[in-house]
Curated annotation (Swiss-Prot):
The keyword Transcription regulation does not apply. The gene is rpsP. Residues 113-122 have a biased composition (Basic residues). GO terms for cellular component: cytoplasm; small ribosomal subunit. PANTHER family: 30S RIBOSOMAL PROTEIN S16, SMALL RIBOSOMAL SUBUNIT PROTEIN BS16M. The keyword Ribosomal protein applies. InterPro entries: Ribosomal_bS16 (IPR000307), Ribosomal_bS16_CS (IPR020592), Ribosomal_bS16_dom_sf (IPR023803). This is Small ribosomal subunit protein bS16. Belongs to the bacterial ribosomal protein bS16 family. It comes from the Bacteria.
Length: 136
């Protein structure tokens, strides 16, 4: 069975992963068939680059992405695009849907960042209140 999975590269404490197509029996950093992308988890925001055409080819050939790679592919919108193609949509409809999807993802990202900053400020206020309350 062929898998699409991560292969670790980089150095100690600074991982960079290659998204590779490999036989399921080969070790994590062992022999692989093709490099189809990269993933940098230490970059802010996480950097994912993929070769969409090659991933589509390998998935149609029968390669199964691991759970982590599947979520990385999903963040790029490739799975949604493939689903639209399988539903028989035209290229114009697919491009319009993908634009809407990207806008929706940008809104979700902004909401997540706003919520994160709100929680951070609330935590700081609570700590400051506890510090001043503890002194009195």
């Amino acid at each position: 069975m062929v898998k699409i999975r991560l292969k670790r590269a980089g150095r100690k404490k600074l991982p960079v992963y290659q998204i590779v197509v490999a036989d399921a029996r080969s070790p994590r950093d062992g022999k692989f068939l093709e490099v189809v992308g990269t993933y940098q988890p230490t970059a802010k925001p996480h950097a994912v680059t993929i070769k969409k055409d090659r991933i589509v080819y390998w998935m149609q050939t029968g390669a199964q992405p691991t759970a982590t790679v599947n979520s990385l592919i999903r963040t790029t919108g490739l799975l949604y695009e493939l689903r639209l193609k399988s539903m028989g949509r035209s290229e114009a409809e697919i491009s319009a849907e993908m634009e809407k999807w990207q806008e929706h993802q940008a809104v979700r990202r902004q909401k997540r960042l706003a919520l994160k900053s709100h929680r951070r400020s609330a935590k700081k206020e609570a700590e400051a209140k506890a510090a001043t309350g503890g002194e009195a």
